[in-house]
Each structure stands twice: as structure tokens, then as C-alpha cells.
């Protein structure tokens, strides 16, 4: 079997694609991987060096939600159609739903990791104002979802949201994201500290909740673009957000090795997002045996069930209370860490994810052959 996979190098889809492609290649599946967004740096592609059966085609086509993405979508669609004719794969696995109606003769799977309209609704409480660009965006997503042979989402919440925004697909399937637990160390002695990952200014990630109340433990936010931090949060020379009430350490983007160390040493991971179709970073924290404190939103409830501690939706006071609760009760903190770790091992491994995608590929190929 030969699978064409698309990914982008700008978001967490790149991590997802690495797990997918590595898992497929390890099972003898031939993969052609096309990336969009930016041509990746060498450290982003080092994982490919030992893979057999991988043909990698980096491009700089912009994504549909980016500036000038509309023009690039036409060009990237033509590129993909030409590539399919050249390499003749058996299945197309597009991680951008806008390609679901690409005029090719093989089964087309699209995966909707997130989308602009549902992000806007979660952040602003209403749909974005109508514009020519928004009508174009909604149209290409609706056509892609209607045209695909199968539409995948990383949570049931995301699938329901997708259908309400863009219409029902011909066939839908929820396949939860997965990570390989071998990358993470759950056995390191923990520091009494809190970790969160994301940009402080990102309204969807809502990490500013961690700066609004006095907290009993040191907090580290990773992946912050310091020049974009709002002006009311003064940045000292030692790279900390410091006010009378809060002291939060900010770290710029980390390598995977650096981030794994931070996960392994932190006792608590906080998922503050008000928009989160899955949360790969929370999963990585769970594999590192961090207790998870999560915003009480439907998608995080779906993923973590009763294995996380939840704070009242978007409420900084409740978040501070839950951090205080775990900081004052080591047994409870370790119990929740163990629960999150077990749930990750049972439900969200890369192996399980690959199994489900292979089943979907085979089913679509069988239907295609029988048609």
C-alpha cells in the first residue's frame, strides 16, 4: 500500500504527521509526505533519516487560513493532482480538509484538526463577521468535507463542531491522536512546579489565566513569543512575567529534548485552552506522568474523563484553587498523575492511532475495488 500524506510545518499537525508516517513506515507502508507552510529546518526532519519507504516533498505553499492562502490553494491543489498522477498512490490522507474534493481517482481521507470558524466562536462567542474571504474559506471547507470519501476528527466534539459549521460528510470517523510513550520519561523525580505550553497572547490557549491570581507553585510557560506579550505584563531581564501577585517564567520555543525534560520534571500540567479539539501537549504531559488540570470544556472532558482535575470554565480563581489543591496534597497530585498516565497508555498511543488509520485505509480500498 502506498499512502500520500499532507502536513504543515507550522502547527502541531507536524508532530501528528511524524507519528503517523513513522508508524506507517515501520509496518512496511510506502509513504509520500508533502509539507506546506514553510520548508522545515534540518532539526524538524531529522526523524526521517532512519525511515525506509518515505519520499518527502517539502513545499512552501501557504495554508488556507494564512495571508494569500487563497491563491496558494489553487496552486497546491494542482501540485497535488499532478503528484498523484506521477506517483500513483493507493490512498490520499490530507490533513487539510480543503483538498477533500481534489479531482483524483483514489480514496480521499481528510482530517480536521481544527478550523478557523470554530476557533473564532470559542474565543469570541459568535461567528466572525461575514466577508468575501470568510465565504471563500467556508466554501472550500464545505466542498472538501462533502467531497472526501471519509472525514476524520481527533475528538467527537470536533466532529460535531465540523458538521455544524460545514455540513455532514459522506462518512465520518473519530480517531484520537496518539503519541509513542517511548519518547517520554514518567520516572523522574518531580519538582513542585506547573507547566503550560503555548503563546501567552493566544486567546484560544488562554494562558493568561495563569498570570491573574497568586499561585502557590512556580509556573513555566513554554513556547512564548516574548515580543508579542501584551504590554501590561512587564518583562524583566531574567525573562519572567512579574507583578505584585504573580511570577511566571517564560521560555521561548524549546527543542523536543528540552521540552521532554520540562515535562518529566513538572508535577502539574495546566491545559487552559478555551478552544482545544484534542491537545497534544496535554497528552505528552500525561505520558510524562504529570497531573493534569484542565479547563472544563467539552473536548477536554471527552479526552480526559475523570483522570484530570477541572477548573470552572475560563475562571482564573478556580484555576488557582485547583493548583493550590494539588500543591497541598502530594498523594492526590500523584494519584491524578497516575490516572492521566494510565489513560494515555490505554487510549492515546501512536500504535492504536496507526491501527485505526490502517483499518480505514483498507476499508476504503475494499469499497473502491468493489465499486
List each model region and its residues:
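Short hydrophobic beta-strand element within catalytic cores of glycosyltransferases
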Residues: 291-294
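Short alpha-helical donor nucleotide-sugar binding micro-motif in glycosyltransferases
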Residues: 145, 261-266
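Aromatic "clamp/platform" in nucleotide-sugar-dependent glycosyltransferases that forms part
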Residues: 274
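Helix-loop-beta element that forms the nucleotide-linked donor phosphate-binding surface
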Residues: 146-147, 153, 159-179, 187
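Membrane-proximal helix-turn-helix segments that form the acceptor-binding/catalytic region
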Residues: 130-151
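Conserved donor-binding/catalytic core segment of Leloir-type glycosyltransferases
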Residues: 188-205, 209-223
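Active-site proximal beta-strand in glycosyltransferases
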Residues: 91, 103-127, 152
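Conserved acidic donor-binding segment of nucleotide-sugar-dependent glycosyltransferases
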Residues: 308-317, 325-331
Amino acid at each position: 500500500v502506498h499512502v500520500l500524506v499532507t502536513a504543515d510545518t507550522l502547527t502541531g499537525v507536524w508532530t501528528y504527521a511524524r507519528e503517523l508516517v513513522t508508524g506507517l513506515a515501520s509496518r512496511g507502508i510506502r509513504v509520500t509526505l508533502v509539507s506546506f507552510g514553510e520548508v522545515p529546518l534540518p532539526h524538524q526532519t531529522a526523524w526521517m533519516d532512519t525511515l525506509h519507504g518515505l519520499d518527502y516533498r517539502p513545499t512552501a505553499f501557504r495554508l488556507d487560513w494564512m495571508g494569500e492562502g487563497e491563491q496558494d490553494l489553487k496552486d497546491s491543489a494542482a501540485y497535488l493532482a499532478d503528484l498523484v498522477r506521477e506517483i500513483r498512490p493507493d490512498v490520499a490522507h490530507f490533513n487539510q480538509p480543503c483538498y477533500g474534493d481534489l479531482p483524483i481517482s483514489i480514496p480521499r481521507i481528510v482530517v480536521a484538526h481544527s478550523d478557523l470558524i470554530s476557533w473564532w466562536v470559542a474565543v469570541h462567542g459568535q461567528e466572525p463577521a461575514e466577508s468575501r474571504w470568510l465565504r471563500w474559506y467556508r466554501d472550500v471547507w464545505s466542498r472538501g468535507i462533502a467531497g472526501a470519501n471519509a472525514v476524520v476528527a481527533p475528538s467527537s466534539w470536533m466532529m460535531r463542531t465540523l458538521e455544524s459549521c460545514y455540513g455532514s460528510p459522506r462518512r465520518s470517523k473519530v480517531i484520537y491522536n496518539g503519541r509513542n510513550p517511548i519518547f517520554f520519561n514518567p520516572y523522574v523525580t518531580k519538582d513542585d512546579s506547573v507547566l503550560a505550553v503555548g503563546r501567552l497572547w493566544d486567546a484560544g490557549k488562554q494562558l493568561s489565566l495563569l498570570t491573574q491570581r497568586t499561585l502557590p507553585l512556580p509556573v513555566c510557560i513554554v513556547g512564548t513569543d516574548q515580543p508579542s506579550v501584551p504590554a501590561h505584563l512587564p518583562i524583566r531581564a531574567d525573562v519572567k512575567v512579574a507583578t505584585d501577585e504573580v511570577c511566571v517564567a517564560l521560555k521561548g520555543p524549546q527543542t523536543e529534548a528540552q521540552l521532554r525534560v520540562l515535562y518529566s520534571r513538572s508535577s502539574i500540567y495546566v491545559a487552559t485552552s478555551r478552544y482545544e479539539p484534542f491537545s497534544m501537549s496535554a497528552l505528552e504531559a500525561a505520558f510524562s506522568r504529570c497531573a493534569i488540570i484542565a479547563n472544563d470544556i467539552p473536548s477536554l472532558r471527552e479526552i480526559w474523563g475523570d483522570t484530570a482535575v477541572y477548573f470552572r470554565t475560563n475562571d482564573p480563581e478556580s484555576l488557582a484553587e485547583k493548583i493550590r489543591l494539588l500543591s497541598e496534597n502530594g498523594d492526590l497530585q500523584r494519584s491524578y498523575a497516575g490516572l492521566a498516565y494510565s489513560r494515555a497508555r490505554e487510549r492515546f498511543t501512536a500504535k492504536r492511532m496507526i491501527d485505526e488509520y490502517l483499518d480505514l485505509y483498507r476499508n476504503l480500498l475494499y469499497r473502491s475495488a468493489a465499486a
